[in-house]
A protein has these predicted regions:
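NAD(P)H-binding glycine-rich loop region in Rossmannoid oxidoreductase-like domains
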Residues: 1-25
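Active-site phosphate-binding strand-loop segment of PLP-dependent enzymes
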Residues: 17, 40-43
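Catalytic helix-loop patch of NAD(P)-dependent Rossmann-fold dehydrogenases
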Residues: 21-33, 43-46, 55-108
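Residue(s) in the substrate-gating loop at a strand-loop-helix junction
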Residues: 52
Length: 108
């Protein structure tokens, strides 16, 4: 006897909160996975992490944002981008900010 197989095993979620939560998990978890992987690289490597101006506090600037501007997070997407910036900076300071490190990371 064949069992009817559910082709869509995941419950469909159409609310915006679920979508934002999924995007945020992907952004943050991918950043953590990349940074953790870099800790095990044994050759000279340069990494440029490109984020978005959405990570900064929105103050309706007419000029472009600078990396010294205040991080934001007033909506879920902005919060996840700001979280990624914080993660990258903490990994740089904790693991890659010494003369012996073969890994060089910058954000733009």
């Amino acid at each position: 006897m064949l069992m009817k197989r559910n082709l869509y095993p995941y419950k469909k979620q159409h609310n915006i909160t679920h979508i934002y939560t999924t995007i945020n998990k992907i952004l943050v978890n991918t950043t953590i996975n990349l940074l953790e992987s870099l800790r095990h690289v044994k050759k000279k490597t340069t990494v440029i992490i490109v984020t978005s101006d959405k990570c900064y506090l929105n103050i309706e600037k007419k000029s472009s944002y600078k990396e010294t501007d205040t991080l934001g997070g007033e909506d879920p997407y902005s919060a996840s981008k700001a979280s990624c910036e914080i993660l990258v900076n903490s990994y740089i300071k904790s693991f890659f900010n010494n003369k012996k490190s073969l890994i060089k990371i910058c954000t733009v």
